[in-house]
Amino acid sequence: KRQGLGRKLESLRWGFVPNWYRTVNAGPLLINARSETIAQKPAFANASRERRCLIPCSGFYEWSKDLEGNKTPWFIKRNDDAPLVFGGVWQEWVMKVR
């Protein structure tokens, strides 16, 4: 999070909760957004302009499916084991009380 001219490191929960959800379980948590459409999607538009972040990680999984439909996870990481960083967006979500 931006603090004045600096930055702030925080631990956050994975999964984007759109601000129109009445509860955290009102629908699926969104876990990815396409860079080509993020600014136009209602769930991400404001966050893509105002709440960007960097997400450090050691790697990530991609899944492949064979002809029988069996899925295989592939862990993608750097050869030198240095950290990777993803661009992300974040959202503060507060349950609306009626």
PLM regions and their residue ranges:
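A contiguous catalytic/ligand-binding core that recognizes phosphate-bearing ligands
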Residues: 33-98
